[in-house]
Amino acid sequence: MSNKKQKEEINTAGGSVILKTMVRDKDKEQKEEKREKKEKKRLEKKEAENVKKEKKKEKKELKKIGKAGRSGSITSDSSTHSGAQEFDSYGNDSNGGGGGLSASIDSNGLSSSGQPMQTRHLEKEVGEKQGIYSLSSQDRSSSLPHSSQDDQAKPLITESEIFSSESFLIAVSDTDHLGPAIKSVFENNKEKEVIKILNAYIAQKDLDIEKICGENHEGFINSVTAFLGLKGENLDLKQDVINLNYELQEIGRKYVTKAEELFAYKQIKDNIKRTKEVLNNCQYAILLGMKVDEYVQQKKYYQAIKNMDQLHNVYLKKLSDFQFARNMDYNIPVLKEKIKKLVKDEFNQWMVEIKEKSAVIGKLGMIQTSKKLLKEREINPLKIKTTFGENEQIWDKILDIPPIINSSSIGSLALYPTLNSPVTAPIYSPNSGKTPSSFGFNKQINEKDLKEDINQFSPFDESDIQFHPLYQCLFIHASIGQLEEFQAYYTLNRLLQFQLVIQPKESGQVWELFLQQILGYFMVESKVIDSTEPFLSKTTINDSWNSALVKVTSVLQELFTHCVDTQPLIAFKKFVLIFTNTMSFYSYHVQPLYYFLDTMKEKYCQFSIKEAVERFTIILERDSHCSLIIESLEEYKSLILANKLDILERQQLRQLQNSLNNNQFQFGDKNLNNNNNNDDDDDYFDEDENEDDKISKRLPKSFLFSKMVPQFYTLIKKFISEFYEFSDQLTENENFIIRSTDTLIKKINEVLYSYLTQSQAVPQVIQLVINLQHLISGCSFFKDYLNSLILGEDYQKNQSIVNETNKVILNSQNLLYTTKSHGEKLIIKLCEQKIEDLMSSAANIEWFPQNAIDDRPRDYIIDVCTFLEVTLPFISPLSQNLKEEFITKAFKNISESLFSLIYDDQLKKLNLQGVKSFDADLKYIETYVKEKANEKERTTTTSRNMVGYFVELRQLTNFLLSDNPEDFVDPKIKAKHYNLITNIPQLLNILNKYKEESKGFTTSKEIKDRNKKIADAIKKIKDSL
């Protein structure tokens, strides 16, 4: 029975195979038929196109014939006969003499060569007639259609030509002219004639056919014989095909049997394959379930959930018919719930950890930002500009500033000893009364961290914060469809932590730690948003940050009020700037903090100006007020070259050489004079003076100004550099630095003015005036520097293009000019005071000596000349006008003092010896005046004035020493020797005091005669009045 079933199945399978084979063969046949149809259509289409082309050619030929017909000529009999012969010869040659009509004429009555069939034999029967019915030329022209290209062209065939044998047949063969031809026949009732013509044409063709058949009869019989032989062979071939078909049927039955067997075996193979797949799926599902249990035990919940989803969505669905699979599928939600509880516990621990480490995270974030800012500042071209390319430590050395403890460029940002160790730092409390300088401003960042290569790192990795518990919770809650519930849970707990972060503790809190905790909190939120979007709402985080920003700003403003000098303010600003940049790096809105930082500039400038003025006051008090002596190359570079004072000194030395005509004043030690000889001065102007060997050869060297001048340059440069460092990343710095620099120089000018006013030493005041000249040049130096800094590097090249309104203007320069003028006036005033002090000692000189004295000048006049001799070299660096004014007023004061001595009312009497002593003093000062007046630097006016101040004194002294004083009244003698003595009452007063003491009987005749001459002179002078 089973064998029978198998056979039946095999037969069924074989039948199905045969059916499939037949269907496949049928499909192939259908495809081949479709392909043949398509090919046939293509060929028909191509043939139709060829027919159209041939018709077009025929039309062209007909048009040519029509044009020939319109000429009205008819071929002669001879031509007709030759045409018939041509037709016969063509018909015989077309197919080897055995063709029929179809071989020589196509369906349109044309020959195979494309020309119209000739009917000359028909014309021969009808003679030379033009047609059966002839029409007028006008009717013929109206019966045919016009050409579309030329409206005035004549018809192709006229009606008179239609009924000629040849023309009518041509018209009938052309379908385009058939209609008009037939119409004309019926209109003219010529049907019978037309029929006769056609019959004649048909008869002629029959004769032609018979003739052709007669000529090719033998060939036709041979062809029929060959065809009958071919028919017999066809029958044999048909029988062979029938036999072959039978054999194929037999072979096919065997193949069908084998096919049925193969089909049965294939079913068995498929059953085994399906069974194997089911077993493999069961095995994999069991192994995957075991893997899930293993992951759960290892706390790899993420992998466990993924495998459970794969198990549920893929494998268990395929095994839904098995009980164990249904049990496993039922336990998957239970296991997920268990995993949810476990991961939530881990998540809660993670929340506690990030709360405890928020300050550490914030601090590491600030360290990352500080390193980036430090690197940017090192490569920032503005830093090189603002530091003038110099070492800032050298500035402190020049200004005698002790090293600052907090030298860190990133503020009070110290690394914790260990990330998990507690931080001990001063406590911030609004009522603690501590200034920001005690809030940890002096803490430094680890130098190793600053010097190492600044690489971007993750603060979360450094603080050992992993976000795996959060991501795990997110995935698991999303897989069980409770993501929104977890979002609400996370948001609630983080908001509770946020409230704790922004509220300072009751016992107080380190303000840096307070900011770092806030920063750490929002860094975590930013990381969560970026890595889990759209898990958290950015709106919620931004609202939290806005509330924290209000609190932070309030705390910072309160701390800002406690800053009392620049150092804590700088450290405070740097810390806030790092905090702000870190928050900005994590995409939080920090514009209010930048506004707050901008408000610090005003206070910083106040503190910085105050400290700079105090530092300058110390410099001024410590200054030696002597010419600066440079002994080392290092000093020359840091004090002279760095401030371009060598250029200014060179210009002043050139001016000095021109004014002194190569007679330079060298002041200072004698050794300096030996070192600074003429050869050295010539070297000073060499083009290669900046080379170290050239400079070293000129050292030690003396400069006109004191050390205060390079210290002033350094102080201003340090002020500008520190301001730009403080205002890093702030806005509108240009106006602040211009205004602050101008204010600082004004304050320094006030210090100088006050110091000048209090100074009493003439050399000190002179040195200050010289220094002031260099300070004025320094203002120009810093003005050009600020212009290049603000207007760009090309300012020096394109100064003419820059608008005057855009240039930096330092009004303090005018104040320095005023102070310098004040100093110059003070020099003259102090000199006058000194001369008066020295001349005041002449009040005690003896005007009525009893004994003769020598001709030496007295001490007071020697001291005055010595003072002038010592002071004049100090005056030499000053301007020529000031020097002229100084020496002119000095000698004028001396002459006035001498006048006051001799005209003093307290002078009761004087004698000849007293006048001779005064004459010795006057000669000494006159000699000194002439010496100075003859110096080459003196102008003619100055020299004349210097000598002129003592001419009246000389005339008065000569008059008192004259043996004939009564000659004074002689106009000629007076005009020649006493023309400047115009105050007669004073002269009479002196003459009344001028007499020799009478000794009674022992008085000498000489004395008596002199007293008598004086009395006579007094009388004559009075009489002359």
UniProtKB/Swiss-Prot annotation:
| Top-level taxon in the UniProt lineage | Eukaryota
Show the ranges annotated as biased composition (Acidic residues). Answer: 678-691
Pfam families in the cross-refs: EXOC6_Sec15_N (PF20651), Sec15_C (PF04091)
UniProt keyword annotation of Protein transport present: yes
A GO biological-process term: exocytosis
Gene Ontology molecular-function annotations: small GTPase binding
Comp. bias regions, Polar residues: 104-118
Q: Which InterPro entries match?
A: EXOC6/Sec15 (IPR007225), EXOC6/Sec15_C (IPR046361), EXOC6/Sec15_C_dom1 (IPR042045), EXOC6_Sec15_N (IPR048359), EXOC6PINT-1/Sec15/Tip20_C_dom2 (IPR042044)
Q: Which Gene3D superfamilies match?
A: Dsl1p vesicle tethering complex, Tip20p subunit, domain D (1.20.58.670), Exocyst complex subunit Sec15 C-terminal domain, N-terminal subdomain (1.10.357.30)
Which coarse location class applies to the principal site listed for this UniProt protein?
A: cytoplasm
> Coiled coil where?
19-68
- GO cellular component terms, A-Z: exocyst; Flemming body; perinuclear region of cytoplasm
Q: Where in the cell is it found?
A: Cytoplasm; Cytoplasm, Perinuclear region; Midbody, Midbody ring
What the record says about family reads: Belongs to the SEC15 family.
Query: What this chain does, per the record?
Result: Component of the exocyst complex involved in the docking of exocytic vesicles with fusion sites on the plasma membrane.
Protein name (database record): Exocyst complex component 6
Please name the source species.
Dictyostelium discoideum (Social amoeba)
